[in-house]
Regions:
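Phosphate-binding loop of NTP-binding sites
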Residues: 2-189
Length: 191
């Protein structure tokens, strides 16, 4: 019942933001996540969920996937304006769900910051994860690249969905070894 009222409050707040001609970015998600850090469990998803992650190129790739699916006639919910941490993704979901948490879409396509893969998808369905690259970036938040890769590797140990990895980046390609029982691992390369 608590989550119902959180979603209701965020719907009202979103309406106020629209009236004021404001997007709100990750504001709705920040409030909802503060009120209940396990709110991702509340949402009901009956469509494929695709996540794109990388240090560089995730926004363009995410938006290309979403645009391609929309052009094919699908209803796509996506965080096309960025907001790729847990609160931004949660804001996108809150704007597109019913009060009971049902998300009406043919596809959910999310750009997700590399360090937030384990946070968002611990309690939220994920069917396909695309990882493009890792570079030394935002050391204050992510730490060294190796520690980031190890956190994602730990998440992937129990992940059995589609995993699409850039074989040209050795740090990305090695994530395919995280869960030997996952038969849904695919690699791409420029060659």
């Amino acid at each position: 019942m608590k989550n119902f009222f959180i979603v209701l409050a965020m719907k009202i707040l979103n309406l106020i933001l629209k009236i004021c001609h404001k997007n709100g970015g990750n504001f709705l998600g920040k409030i909802a996540f503060d009120w209940n850090p396990e709110i991702f469990k509340y949402f009901k998803v009956n469509c494929p969920v695709i996540a794109v992650s990388a240090t560089n190129g995730k926004t363009m790739t995410n938006n290309c996937i979403g645009y391609t699916l929309k052009t094919a006639g699908n209803k796509v919910v996506s965080n096309v304006e960025g907001n790729n941490m847990e609160t931004g993704i949660l804001s996108t979901i809150l704007k597109n769900c019913t009060l009971t948490g049902k998300i009406k879409a043919d596809y959910l396509v999310f750009e997700v910051d590399e360090s937030y893969i384990p946070v968002v998808f611990k309690d939220f369905r994920l069917d396909t994860l695309v990882i493009l690259n890792f570079f030394r970036d935002q050391l204050d938040r992510n730490g060294e690249v190796e520690s980031l890769i190890l956190r994602i590797n730990d998440f992937l140990k129990t992940y059995n969905g589609n995993l699409i990895l850039n074989n040209d980046d050795p740090n990305v390609a090695r994530l395919g070894q995280a869960n030997p029982s996952n038969e849904n691992i695919y690699y791409f390369s420029v060659d």
